[in-house]
């Protein structure tokens, strides 16, 4: 099973909009569009698990809320700093969703933040 977390990213939204347009023009069927989205889910999860080598660290000023439901952790953090080598990015609020997928945790940083506290 592949999680559908990344459909809500810029790439995922653009893909869905393009597929909707193709369906409306009659160039593909809704069934084919669904197959494309399912393949996207598998491919993006695989790529993030196996190809991304960059590491970053983050530190939160405050854990606002957390919950665990159906093997999915959700954390809402406030006053967060992300650091990668020499670059520092600050966020007012970050939501992290972590799903257990075959012993690998996938993270989604979403909706998040105003850069540098703006």
From Swiss-Prot:
Chief location of this protein within or outside the cell: nucleus
Pfam family, one: TFIIA_gamma_C
Alphabetical keyword list: Nucleus, Transcription, Transcription regulation
Ranges in a coiled coil: none
Family the entry assigns: Belongs to the TFIIA subunit 2 family.
Role according to the record: TFIIA is a component of the transcription machinery of RNA polymerase II and plays an important role in transcriptional activation. TFIIA in a complex with Tbp mediates transcriptional activity.
Quaternary assembly: TFIIA is a heterodimer of the large unprocessed subunit 1 and a small subunit gamma.
Protein name listed in UniProt: Transcription initiation factor IIA subunit 2
Organism of origin: Ixodes scapularis
Native organism taxonomy: Eukaryota, Metazoa, Ecdysozoa, Arthropoda, Chelicerata
């Amino acid at each position: 099973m592949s999680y559908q977390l990344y459909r809500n990213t810029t790439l995922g939204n653009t893909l869905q909009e393009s597929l909707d347009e193709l369906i409306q023009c009659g160039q593909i069927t809704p069934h084919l569009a669904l197959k494309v989205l399912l393949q996207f889910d598998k491919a993006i999860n695989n790529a993030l698990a196996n190809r991304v080598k960059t590491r970053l660290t983050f530190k939160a000023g405050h854990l606002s809320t957390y919950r665990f439901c159906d093997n999915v952790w959700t954390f809402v953090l406030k006053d967060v700093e992300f650091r990668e080598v020499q670059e520092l990015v600050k966020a007012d609020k970050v939501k992290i969703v972590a799903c257990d997928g075959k012993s690998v945790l996938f993270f989604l940083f979403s909706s998040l933040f105003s850069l540098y506290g703006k």
